[in-house]
């Protein structure tokens, strides 16, 4: 396989490790003439992989084409292969718990999985929650690990049971349109206006690695954001820059504090 170096020019330096991994997957498909299934990846990575697959003429199918989710698994494959939903080797686990005592949050579930199981984020996908239920998409091979390793989240006893995809919780993310005054498109300045925090406070959030831009952790307060960027701030939610009106900026924001990173 001849690597087209021009591909790298279309993406940032932060994307290089994932591009390299994507090219490894593509080479494996070409060498084995067999499909390759990725771990769970985010929408930005999915976009990169779609470009790579198109460049090298491989088949491309996302699990999101069957099940609308944010984190997806992708199949790269030769022309003879016809993907089915079972080929993505995903499972949906219901987190059963006594909801009358306390409501599980996205952040608590994520923290338990990362800290208690010590597994990589790419082994599980979206965490879904509503007032009384919670679910998680996982790599099917790791169902026993999740079921045996998670017996309590916070103070609540839990059990994990596989359920059909048709029973999944439907996301209800309420995005609101807001217009804010902006002195510049520096990350700390924009967050200060959007979150109504001081520049010092937003700089501290950035330094603590609590801020992502397009699914990448950004650690520089002077990072320049642009129209189309998706910004996620731990415990504050998300905002997307929709339009630059000169001295003002139009945003879509998720109003409820919710950690989805």
What are these regions (language model features)?
Residues 116, 127, 135-143:
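Conserved mixed alpha/beta catalytic, RNA-binding, or beta-rich assembly cores of soluble enzyme
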Residues 235-240:
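Short, charged beta-turn/beta-strand-edge "cap" motif at the junction between a beta-strand
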Residues 178-227, 244:
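A basic, amphipathic helix-loop patch mediating RNA/tRNA/ribosome contacts
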Residues 252-261:
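Single conserved hydrophobic/aromatic residue that forms the stacking wall/gate
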Residues 161-181:
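N-terminal beta-hairpin/loop module of FHA
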Residues 1-130:
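Electropositive, beta-rich accessory/interaction domains or terminal extensions
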Residues 151-158:
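A common structural junction motif
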């Amino acid at each position: 396989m001849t690597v087209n170096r021009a591909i790298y020019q279309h993406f940032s330096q932060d994307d290089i490790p994932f591009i390299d991994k994507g090219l490894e997957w593509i080479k494996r498909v070409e060498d084995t003439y067999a499909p390759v299934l990725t771990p769970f990846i985010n929408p930005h990575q999915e976009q990169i992989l779609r470009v790579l697959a198109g460049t090298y003429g491989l088949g491309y199918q996302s699990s999101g084409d069957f099940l609308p989710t944010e984190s997806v698994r992708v199949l790269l494959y030769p022309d003879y292969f016809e993907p089915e939903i079972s080929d993505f080797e995903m499972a949906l686990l219901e987190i059963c718990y006594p909801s009358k005592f306390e409501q599980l949050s996205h952040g608590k579930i994520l923290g338990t999985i990362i800290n208690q199981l010590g597994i990589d984020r790419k082994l599980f996908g979206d965490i879904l929650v509503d007032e009384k239920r919670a679910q998680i998409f996982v790599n099917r091979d790791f169902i026993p690990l999740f079921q045996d390793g998670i017996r309590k989240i916070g103070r609540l006893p839990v059990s994990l049971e596989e359920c059909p995809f048709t029973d999944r919780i439907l996301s209800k993310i309420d995005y609101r349109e807001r217009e804010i005054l902006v002195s510049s498109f520096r990350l700390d300045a924009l967050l200060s206006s959007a979150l109504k925090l001081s520049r010092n406070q937003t700089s501290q959030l950035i330094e603590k690695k609590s801020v992502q831009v397009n699914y990448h952790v950004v650690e520089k307060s002077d990072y320049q954001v642009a129209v189309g960027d998706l910004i996620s701030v731990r415990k504050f939610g998300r905002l997307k820059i929709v339009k630059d009106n000169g001295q003002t900026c139009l945003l879509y924001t998720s109003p409820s504090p919710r950690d989805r990173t």
